[in-house]
Amino acid sequence: MSKKLFFVLLIVSITSYATKPHVTSVKADTEKSYVYWRGNEVGGFHDGNIKLKSGYIISDHGKLVGGKFIIDMNTITNLDIKSEKYSQKLVNHLKDDHFFDVDKFPTSMLIIKNAKKISDQNYNITADLTVRGITNEINFISNVRIRGNQFQAEGDIVIDRTKWDVKYRSSIIGTVADKLIEDNIEF
């Protein structure tokens, strides 16, 4: 009788644990966290980093379920141009109203609305991305490792910048082909 009772209690205990939410919020380390960006143009590309201002993920039983990241657009950098003068010229151009209009919109935001686990550490993520005050839904695959109060996330996001009103030298406005900057930006 006691063995049967123990087994029943064990099943109830396991079932109870499995259905009880265990939601945890883990803050991003803004000193180590950044967004890598890459934009392509005819004959080449530019790339760089942008720092996070703040951010966190939400997990339930160690699985990603949500999150929010504030991106500090004032910290945008360039990596590919070696001349400091020309690198800074590009950064200033990216900050002006042709691109991210950083004076008006100093931050961008990514809010994870849904994260579906597709393999051990990979998730299909649906999120709202706000750039220049315009919000659009995006989908991407991300590799997320959660260990206690630490996490590491990597993923490739490709967006059509024109959906966020970044149309400088875009193909949709009839730019001459040799001056064209691709509409897609990679993060």
For the regions a language model picked out, list residue spans one by one.
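Sec-dependent N-terminal signal peptides
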Residues: K4-S13
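Low-complexity, acidic/polar, glycine-enriched regions of mature
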Residues: Y17-F187
